[in-house]
Curated annotation (Swiss-Prot):
Residues 1-32 form the signal peptide. This is Alpha-amylase inhibitor Haim-2. Inhibits mammalian alpha-amylases specifically but has no action on plant and microbial alpha-amylases. One of its GO terms (molecular function) is alpha-amylase inhibitor activity. It comes from Streptomyces griseosporeus. Disulfide bonds join 43-59, 77-104.
């Protein structure tokens, strides 16, 4: 009985060690995909849950923002005046994640890469 319990425990530990390693590689790929967008400044905050993502502009100027998702979902840019709270889709129930709020150009396209401010 002790041998069975010990081998079961060892097998479980091995599985738990392999799963995070594969997840970390997937997360790095997601960060690279989002790296072509400029992160919103620190005064633009976001809160994400499964259904909605709220982006709040606590800055003193307007920003055009959108949300970067782990699976590359593209949502339209929206203008946020100071004090505005914008609502975007949440991360859902299928393993997606919200990477952060990102800035948009005035024409609604992604801004060019700035590696120091890119979403990571």
């Amino acid at each position: 009985m002790k041998r069975y319990v010990c081998s079961t425990f060892v097998a479980c530990v091995m599985v738990l060690c392999v799963i995070p390693a594969s997840g970390a590689a997937a997360h790095e790929a997601v960060a690279e995909d989002a790296g072509n967008r400029i992160a919103a400044p620190a005064c633009v905050h976001f809160t994400a849950d499964w259904r909605y993502t709220f982006v709040t502009n606590d800055c003193s100027i307007d920003y055009s923002v959108t949300v970067a998702y782990g699976d590359g979902t593209d949502v339209p840019c929206r203008s946020a005046n100071p004090g505005d709270i914008l609502t975007f889709p949440g991360y859902g129930t299928r393993g997606n994640e919200v990477l952060g709020a990102v800035l948009c150009a005035t024409d609604g396209s992604a801004l060019p890469v700035d590696r120091e401010r890119a979403v990571r």
